[in-house]
Amino acid sequence: MKANSDKFKQSNKATRRVLAGVLCGASVLSLVLSLVMPPISQAIANDAQTVPTVKTVAEDSSTESTDVDNTNNGVTENQNSDETESGESNTIATEADQPSDDAGVGDAAQPVEDDTNGENAIALAAGNESDHKISSGEELSTRLLNPDLRDNNGAATFELAADIECDEEILLEGANTKITLDLNGFKIKHESSNQPLFSITGGATLTVKDGAQTAPTEPPFNQKIMNGNLASMECDDSNIPNKLTYYVTESVAKGTGTTETLKEYKVDIKGAIVACGDNADLKLVNLYKTGTFNLESGTITQQQNSGDQKNSVNSLVYAEEGSIVNMSGGYVCGATSMNHGAGIELGTMNNSGATLNLTGGVIAGNYAPIGGGVNAYGSKINMTGGTISGNGTFKDLPGYGAGICAQNSDVTVSDGYVTNNNCQFDYIKQQGMEDKHKGNGCHGGGGIAAFNGGSLTINGGYITGNYSAEAGGGIYAGAWGQALSSFKFSGGTIASNVAQNSEGGGIRIAAPTVGVFEVPKGSHAYITNNTTNTTNDWGGGGVFVQGYGDNVQAASLKIYNALITKNDAQGFGGGFAACPTGETAITNTYGIAIFGNTDKNGEHRS
C-alpha cells in the first residue's frame, strides 16, 4: 500500500498538471376565462389554507448573441463549451426586431450543519485520519486524487484544517470517485484565472459542505420598498467575502388576497470556495460528461474588487453533457459575469444539457447580462425549495432574467422563493436614449425569463418582490417570435412584482406564446399586488398578453381558474391588459376571480 502511495505521489508530482384589463396594438387574442374556482365567497376560504412561510432563514456583451466561450480546461480532455452547437440558436430578439406594442420561498433558512448526511453519508476511508485533513493547496490536490485514501466504493471524506490557496485544476473522474469535502469553516482561495479548481466528469461526484456554517440572522428591519432589493457582500481586508445580506419578500394568503412583508437576512460566511482570479472564462466548479456536484452547505463565491471595475468569472458553477447540480443548502453568491449565468450556468454539448435540482440554499448577489443568478440553455431547472434572491442584470446593457433566464429549457417551480431580483437596464436613463419609446417591452424578466422553446411550469412557490426596469416584473414568458412550447400556471403566488417602463407587472406573455392558468381543485394560485408604472396606453398590472406582428401570431391566454386581484397599472388594465383590436371572449361559468384591481388612466377599478 505504501509503495503504491509513493508511486502515486511521484507520478503526481512529475506531471504537476493535477488532473484532478384590455388594450394595446393590433392583435387577434382570445382570453377564455372559465374559472373552475368557486365564486368569490368560496375564494374567501383561501384564508383557511395554510401557506408555507419563509423560515428564518453590472459588460461587454450583447443580447443579440448569447453565445459564450469555448474554454478548453488546459491539461484536461474536457471540450466543454457554452458555445452553442450547429443548429442551435442562443440569440434573442432585440427591440429593432420587434414591433412596438402600440403598432400595427419555501425555506430561506440555512440549516446548521449537523455532520449527518443521512443515506448519502460517505464515511472516512480506512487509514490514518490525519491523511484526510488538508492544510495546503498541495495536500488538496494530492489527497483528493489518491485512490489509496478511498474505500472500496471510491468514497472518501476530507476536511480542511486551515485556509489554503490552490492554483491547480483538480480533475475528479470516473463513477468510482465519490469525494466529500468539509470546508470546516475555512476557505479555499483559487488563484488561477484560466482553469477551474474542480473539474468533475465521467460519473464522478463531489459533495461540498461546511460543518461550521451557522444559520442566517434576521435583524430588526423596517424598509418599505418591497421589490428589487439587491443582495450585498461585505469583505475582509483581502476583498474575500465574509458577509452576505439578502432579502425575501414573504407572502402570506389572507382572505381573497395576499399580504407581503420584506425580510432581511444576514449571513456570516465561514467555509468557502473563492475564485480569486479575474478571467471572464473561468468556471470555478466545472462539470461535463455526467459529473455530479452536491452543495449541502458552505459558500461558493468570488473575490470582490474595491474599485469600480468588478472581477469577473464565466460562472461559479458550470455544468453540461448530462451533468447534475444538486443544491440543498449553502450559498452561491457575489459573482459577476460578462457572459451569462454568473452564479450557476447550465449549457449544452453534444446535444446534451444539464440539470439543476434546487431543494435548498440561497443563490444571491450575482450579476450578468443574462441570467444573473441562474442561466440555462437546453437544460432543466427543478426548484422545489431554496431561495434565488437579489441577483441582477447590468444597468448599462439590455438583459433578461435577473433571477433565472432559460432558453430552450424546461423550468419547473414547485416551492421556494424567487424574490427581489432586479432586471436593471432602463432605456430612459441611458445617454442618447432619452427619447426612446417607453414600454417597448423587448427586455425584462425580473424574476424569471424563459423563451426560445422549452417549458415554464409554476405549480407552487413564490415569485415575489422582483423588479424589471422594462417588462415582466415577475415573469417574462416568451420573447418576440421565440415562444415557449408550454407555459402553465397551476399554483403558487406571484405577488408584489413591478414592471417600471413597460407592461406586465406580474407576468408578460410575449407573442406567440400560449399561456394556460389552470388550478387543480384544492390548490390555490394568486396573482396579487403587482404593478406596472408605464403611463402609455397599455399596462397589465397583473398580466399582459402581447399582440401579433409581421409573421408572428398573437400571444394568447386561457384562464380556467386563478385569483387576480389588487394589482395596479398607471396606464390601463390593472388586472390584465391585452390588445384592443382583437377578439376577447370571457365566459363567466363558475364565477370570476378577477376583481379589485386598479388603473390610473381608466380612472376606475378593473
Which ranges hold each PLM region?
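Right-handed parallel beta-helix
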Residues: L183-F186, T205-N227, Y246-Y247, K263-A272, ...
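Extracellular beta-strand-rich solenoid/capping regions of secreted or surface-exposed proteins
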Residues: E165-T180, K189-G211, A215-P220, N227-T245, ...
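Glycine-centered small-residue motifs that form tight turns
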Residues: A280-V285, Q309-V317, S323, N339-T348, ...
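Gram-positive cell-envelope targeting signals
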Residues: M1-T53, L160, V374, I404, ...
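Low-complexity, acidic Ser/Thr/Pro-rich repeat tracts that form intrinsically disordered stalk/linker regions
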Residues: M1-K13, V36-N146
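Glycine-rich repeat segments that build the extracellular carbohydrate-interaction surface of secreted
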Residues: H132-I134, D148-C166, K178-N184
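Short, T/G/N/S-enriched strand-turn elements that build extracellular solenoid repeat scaffolds
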Residues: L140-D151, C166-G174, L181, F293, ...
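Polar/charged low-complexity regions in secreted precursors and cytosolic/nuclear IDRs
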Residues: D69-N70, D114, T290, S297-G298, ...
